[in-house]
């Protein structure tokens, strides 16, 4: 399986998971609002501190994004491109988003795919500080209590990454999901199956799904050989030996791809964030 050497030592825990109370939501985010503000107001209205969601429809404008790039120095295994700022309203096709906190303030980690005003399809890592809703966007997924995603410095990758952190204890009767982060160089399918099994879930639904893998090996599409990607999970069901992960990604050349991942051959590059609930 492919492997990318990270600049720092791997931590002892490769699957970080905390029990949560997950609340399903399906709501519309209003035109004119900052995406960051709208999402945190949604969470607050439901007594939550964030969550993992899929966004669809509507439009963004103005907004800004980056795509993967080669690292300029050995302090990271990969990095970000210069910032792109499309003109006009950009129609959102799909995005996966983790809503949490960075340095005590609201923050999100979001990978999306869209069609720009000139008809050009695009995708990448959307910047929280520069993303405004130009037409109402549908938000579906789960909000969480009992833990929240906090951006913390990660010694292995050199990045400040979202990781689930317990906020209030969740006992066996109140918890109905787990918030997770997967660390680098482990197969994404095997790790998700292990996370679900560790929580006692015979099968699980994946919510959100923001991260990166080392290129891609699809069951139904040509492979992606460039190692640096930004990925979202469009649909994920976790079952022992029968997990199905339907993803979309952009690589460091800007090439877009999508398909169902081949189990056992798609290692995590930097991270994967998600919430799992039993089915």
Specify the residue positions occupied by each region the protein language model found.
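Alpha/propeptide regions of enzymes that mature by internal proteolysis
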Residues: 1-115, 174-211, 220-279
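A short mid-domain helix/strand-loop element embedded in enzyme catalytic domains
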Residues: 164-174
């Amino acid at each position: 399986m492919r492997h990318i050497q990270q600049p720092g030592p791997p931590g002892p825990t490769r699957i970080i998971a905390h029990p949560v109370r997950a609340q399903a939501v399906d709501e519309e985010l209003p035109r004119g609002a900052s995406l960051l503000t709208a999402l945190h107001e949604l969470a607050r209205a439901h007594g939550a501190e964030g969550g993992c969601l899929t966004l669809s429809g509507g439009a963004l404008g103005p907004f800004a994004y980056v795509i993967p790039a080669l690292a300029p120095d050995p302090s990271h295994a990969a990095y970000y491109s210069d910032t792109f700022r499309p003109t006009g309203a950009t129609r959102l096709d799909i995005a996966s988003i983790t809503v949490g906190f960075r340095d005590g303030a609201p923050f999100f980690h979001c990978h999306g795919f869209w069609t720009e005003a000139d008809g050009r399809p695009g995708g990448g890592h959307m910047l929280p500080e520069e993303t405004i809703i130009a037409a109402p966007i549908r938000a579906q997924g789960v909000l969480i209590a009992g833990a929240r995603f906090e951006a913390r410095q990660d010694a292995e990758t050199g990045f400040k990454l979202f990781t689930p952190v317990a906020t209030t204890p969740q006992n066996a009767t109140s918890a109905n999901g787990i918030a997770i982060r997967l660390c680098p160089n482990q197969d994404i399918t095997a790790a998700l199956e292990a996370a679900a099994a560790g929580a006692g879930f015979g099968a699980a639904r994946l919510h959100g799904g923001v991260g990166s893998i080392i290129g891609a090996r699809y069951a139904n599409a040509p492979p992606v050989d460039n190692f640096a990607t930004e990925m979202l999970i469009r649909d994920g069901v976790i079952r022992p030996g029968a997990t199905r992960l339907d993803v979309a990604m952009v690589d460091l050349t800007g090439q877009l791809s999508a398909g169902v991942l081949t189990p056992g051959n798609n290692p995590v590059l930097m991270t994967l964030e998600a919430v799992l609930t039993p089915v």
